[in-house]
Structures are given as C-alpha cells and as structure tokens.
Amino acid sequence: MTEQPTTANQMWGGRFAAGPDAIMEAINASIGFDQRLYAQDIRGSRAHAAMLAAQGIISTSDAEAIGEGLLTVLSEIEKGDFPFSTALEDIHMNVESRLKEIIGEPAGRLHTARSRNDQVATDFRLWVRDQCDAAIAGLDALIRAALSQAEKGADWVMPGFTHLQTAQPVTWGHHMMAYVEMFGRDLSRFRDARKRMNESPLGAAALAGTGFPIDREATARALGFERPMANSLDAVSDRDFALEYLSSAAICAVHLSRLAEELVIWSSAQFRFVTMSDRFSTGSSIMPQKKNPDAAELIRAKIGRILGAAVALFVVMKGLPLAYSKDMQEDKEQVFDASDNLMLALAAMTGMLTDLTANRERLEAAAGSGFSTATDLADWLVREAGLPFRDAHHATGALVAMAEQAGIDLPDLTLEQMQSVNPAITADVYGVLGVHNSVASRMSYGGTAPAQVRAQIARWKEKLEEKSA
C-alpha cells in the first residue's frame, strides 16, 4: 500500500487529511529564491512581536524570547548554518519552524494578528525599498563618472549623429551630458518610486484586517515606513511597488543599453573614438590582435533580462482578482533577477566610463566629415542673405551636391563656386564652416557650445552635492 504524504510539517495542515504530493511541493515551494528575504522577514517579525507585547496581546517575556530567537536564526542564516527545507515552502515558514525549535511554545504566538499575506507583502516591500536605495547610489556614481568625462571634453569637437549618419558637430562633453540627463531622470524615478512604496502593509492580515488591538503605526515606524497602508485589501493585493521598481529599472536599462551600443561602435577600428580599458575588455582565443568590448556587450545583453522581467510581472498581475493569489509568488524572481542585473550593469558602466579614454584627435578629425556644417551654411544664408529658411536649405543642398561631386568638403568650395548657386554669398561665409565655430555658436540653453556644457556640468555638480548633503 502506498504511504500517503502527511501534513506534519505544514503550518496550515490542520484542515487536511493528507499532505501534498511531491509535485505539489515542488511547484509550491519558493524557498529556493525567497530565502533572499530572510533579513527583511526577521526584521518584520521582530517589529511585530514587539508591537504585540506593547499592546498586551502577548507577554513581554514571550516577545523577548521571540526577538532573541530570531536573532539566533539571523546569525545561523548569515553563517550558512541554517537548515532550509523545501517542505516548509518559503522563508516565512522556515524561519518560524526554526524559531520553534530554538525557543519552543512562544514561537507559536508570533503569528498572532498576522497572515503570510501581509507578512510577505511587508518583506518584499522592504527588500524592494532597499533596492531602490541601491539603484540610487549606483546611478549617483555613474552620473559622477559621466560628468568627469564631460568635464574633460567640454570643448572637444566630435560628430553628432542622426540615423548614425553625420548630422552636426557637437562636443564630447555635450554628448556625455545627454547621458547625465538620462541617468538623472532614472535616479529621480527610483526616488519617486521609493516614496510611493514607503507605506506598511503589516497588520492588514489576510485581507480584512484583524480583531486584535494592534498598533499599525508602531510597526510602520519601527520598519522605517512613513505610515500604514490605508486599505487592508489593497495592502495584501498590491504589487505596484514591484512594478514601479521594474519600470524604473527597465527605462534605466534602455539608457544603459544605448550607451553600451555607442561604446561598442566607437571602440571599433572603423571609428576609434574611444579606447576601452583593459580592465573592461577581453581577448580572443584564436585572434591575438583582438580587444573585445565584452563588458559593454554584456550590459547590452543583460538589459534584455531586465525588460523581460518587467513584462513578465505585468502579465502575472494583469488578471488577478483581489486579494492574494498564489500567482503572486512569481513576483520575486523577476525582481531579484532584474535587480541583480541592473546593479551589475550600473557598476560595469561606471567602471568603463571611469577608465574610458576618448581619442580627441580622432573625434575632431571626424567632426567635419559628412558636410556636418551644412546647417550652419543654411543659417548664414538666412541671417546674412535674407533668404527664407526653405530657400536657404535648397541652396545649401545644391552646394553639398557640388562638393560631393567634386570629392571635397564644403569649406573647400571656392567663393566663385558658391556664388554660382547664390550670388549673395560672400567670403564671410567661410567663418561659419569650421566645426569649432559651429559648436561655439550653439549658445541656446542646453546647446553644445562649450560655455553651455560647462554651465550644465556645474548645475549637475551642485545638484548632486545638494542631494548628498
């Protein structure tokens, strides 16, 4: 006769005549990944126990035993001595079971006025809040590295691109400051997300609250939350905080990927705009000459995992009725993986930018290619010859075609050639056709003129110092 599984190890087993099938245990268990929440779980449980004692719901001696026992559990986990069990499903039941082994009967009082629903919502929210802080710190370091690059090359001229074709001259500093702005918005998004998630679900119990006279304000304060969540159903159903974290991570990931792509292109022999540090490059097993931008390529690839995690959790959450459904167990792996990859990508990009050498001579040599000052010529025709911009655009296009056919650049056209297209052109036009004059003229707010770039660098330095003060 086949032996039936039992519910002996299950804290919810009282209502069941038989235990779960092995396949059920396998699909139900989350301890393989949610053990990462151990510190948050223990922190939440200690706050809950202290509150229960303060409210006279459990004795002070039981609360003290629970608090000390949980510290023992924490120590065992951090030393690698903790006996994690798949049969106990998750981090919450593993911790409580071990606590019972350590302190006995008082451990059974810990779960008074609490459900795993508000427990996991609290643990996970605490963990994601910590990850917002980590992302903010990582982005701060990355912004500083990009600012350093911008400061070095505030007046280094380089080609600006649209469609990966030469468009207009810009400066290296201006290009780097574009990423500072992007990463700055990312940092703000994580700060905003952190503010919204900084409310405590603890005390919502399963979904309806509890009849015990608990003090949710006290546990919220103890855990560093601003306030308890106002609706118990929402408190256990909500995963907006995880979705907001993933959304912020996904947008940041796109910015990292765009910069990684540019570094891969720019480091190629065909561009030679930048030289990667040996510390963030690898070689080939067969081609001795190779120096591959693997760190940038791996950042670009890992970004796909972050984007995938965001989509996956949105899909999990989109069809769930209130309140808790077991589907929500699938929230954590997505966030864990996205966080791991985001923090690695931020650190790698910061290291790459810190060590990166921009090749000024190559940048400046390329800046004038592709008739990059054609727009300056058209603007000159508007200002000096009084042409409507569309007519100036047409005349400039004709001059570009003339230069292209002759195999020369715009500044190499003779005045006679230029006047054959428009007689109003004078020798003064040559003053706007140089790349340095072109960038210096872009003095509009946010423009590429070195003075504007330096002003933006100073603004960002001040902004960062204000935030860190």
Swiss-Prot record:
Q: What is the protein's species of origin?
A: Paracoccus denitrificans (strain Pd 1222)
CDD domains xref list: Argininosuccinate_lyase
Which Gene3D superfamilies does the protein's record reference? Fumarase/aspartase (C-terminal domain), Fumarase/aspartase (Central domain), Fumarase/aspartase (N-terminal domain)
Q: Any idea where this protein resides?
A: Cytoplasm
Transmembrane region positions? none
Biochemical pathway = Amino-acid biosynthesis; L-arginine biosynthesis; L-arginine from L-ornithine and carbamoyl phosphate: step 3/3
| Name the UniProt record assigns to this protein | Argininosuccinate lyase
Keyword annotations from UniProtKB, A to Z: Amino-acid biosynthesis, Arginine biosynthesis, Cytoplasm, Lyase
Q: Which InterPro entries match?
A: Arg_succ_lyase_C, Argininosuccinate_lyase, Fumarase/histidase_N, Fumarate_lyase_CS, Fumarate_lyase_fam, Fumarate_lyase_N, L-Aspartase-like
Tell me the Gene Ontology biological-process terms attached to this UniProt entry.
arginine biosynthetic process via ornithine; L-arginine biosynthetic process
* Gene Ontology cellular-component terms listed: cytosol
- Which reaction(s) does its UniProt entry say it catalyses? 2-(N(omega)-L-arginino)succinate = fumarate + L-arginine
* Name of the gene encoding the protein in the UniProt record: argH
NCBIfam families annotated for this entry? Answer: argH
Spell out the family assignment given in the record's similarity comment: Belongs to the lyase 1 family. Argininosuccinate lyase subfamily.
The protein's matches in Pfam families, at most eight in alphabetical order, are given as: ASL_C2, Lyase_1
Q: Name one GO molecular function term.
A: argininosuccinate lyase activity
Enzyme Commission number(s):
4.3.2.1
Signal peptide start-end: none
PANTHER family associated with the record: ARGININOSUCCINATE LYASE
| SUPFAM superfamilies per record | L-aspartase-like
Q: What domain of life is recorded for the organism? A: Bacteria
